[in-house]
Amino acid sequence: MIYKGIAATTKVDAHNIRIAKEALEQAAHDINEGKCAPAVVIEHDLTILPIGKVYKAFVDSFDEEDYALHIEQEIFENVSSTIVNGEKYMVVKSDVDDRPFASDIISNNEKLIVGTDSVNFESDEKAKEYLNGLRAEFDIDVQRFCRKSVIPDPELVFQLVENSVKYLLIYLCSKQVVERVGDVLVDTAVNEAKNLYALVKKAIKAGSKYLIPENRPVTYIFKGSFNYIIELIVKTTNPDVAISALNKEKLKEAIDKIDNIKEQFPKILRVQLIYNENEDKWEFNYLTTEVGVVIGTEQSYKKAAKLAEIYLGNSGDINTDASTQTDDVL
C-alpha cells in the first residue's frame, strides 16, 4: 500500500525549528539515491517493528515562501510466517525496495555517545547542563536529537564504540573463551565493562532528576555494532530496573539469546531485545536484514499491525526514522 504525503517543510515547526531548503533537497537525494531508506515507524517508538519504508521523495514549493519534502512510503503488505525450532516468526518485507533501513546504519564513533531529546527537559539550558555534566566526568560525546512529537516519553540513547562492544562480549564470554584470548584482553575487557557500567548508572540516575514528563516511562536504548548492530531496550519508570537489567548475568542471557537468533537468521543487520520487567528477563523483539526484511515475534508483529491500523485510519503520528539532530556535540 502506497501513501503519499509531506514529511517536512521549510516553515518553522512547533519545536521552533526551521529546516533549510538545501537540507530538504539533500534528504530527497538520500531517499532516492542512498544505500539505505528511512523506515516508517509509529510515534518514534523503536520497540514497534517498522511498518513500512520511504522509497521516493522530491522537493516542491509549499506556498509562496516555503518548500516541502514530498515522500512516497510503502506500508508493508508482504507478510508471511516461518517456524524455526518450534517458534513462530513473522516475516515482513517491501515489494518495491530492498535497501536496508537507515536506522540500521550507525557511524563508527570514536567515543561512546549519550543522546537524548531536548524536548524532554524543562529548558535547553537544562539539557546542556545534564549532558555536559556527564561529559565532564566521562570521556564521551553527547548528542541531542528532536523527535517530531508534542512531548514524547523520555528517551536516553547510549551508542557504544565497536571496541567497547568487543570487550563487553569478551567480558561476558565463557571461561574457555576467556582462557583463549589471554589475560591482557581480559583485564582490558573487565575495566571497559566497569567504566561503561559506571557511566550508564550515573546517566540513568542523573537523568531521573532532569527528564520530563515526570512519572512517564523512560526508554533506555543501548546499541553498538560488532559485525551487526545489537540493540537492547529497557522501558521503565524505575531507574533501578534499567540498571539491574544490565548486570553481568542478565547481559549474558541477552547475548546467548542473540547468538541463538543469529544461528537461525544469519543475515542479521540489527537485532533488538526488550527487557521484560514483569518477568525480569530479556526477550527477542525483532531483527532486520541486509535487504530490509523485518523478522519478529508473532506478538511484536500483531502489536505493530494493530497500531498501524489505528494510526493510518486516524491519520496519526506515523513517522520516518529520521529525527532532527540539533547538536552533534555540545
Model-derived features: positions:
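Membrane-inserting effector segments that mediate pore formation, membrane fusion
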Residues: 139-211
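Hydrophobic, Leu/Ile/Phe/Ala-enriched alpha-helical segments that form helix-helix packing faces
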Residues: 24-35, 130-138, 197-208, 254-265
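Membrane-active, amphipathic/fusogenic segments and juxtamembrane/transmembrane anchors
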Residues: 2-156, 220-245, 291-293, 303, ...
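Short glycine-rich, low-complexity/disordered patches
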Residues: 36-44, 140-151, 202-217, 261-281
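A long, low-hydrophobicity, low-complexity, charged/polar interaction segment common
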Residues: 227-307
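Amphipathic, membrane-active segments
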Residues: 188-257
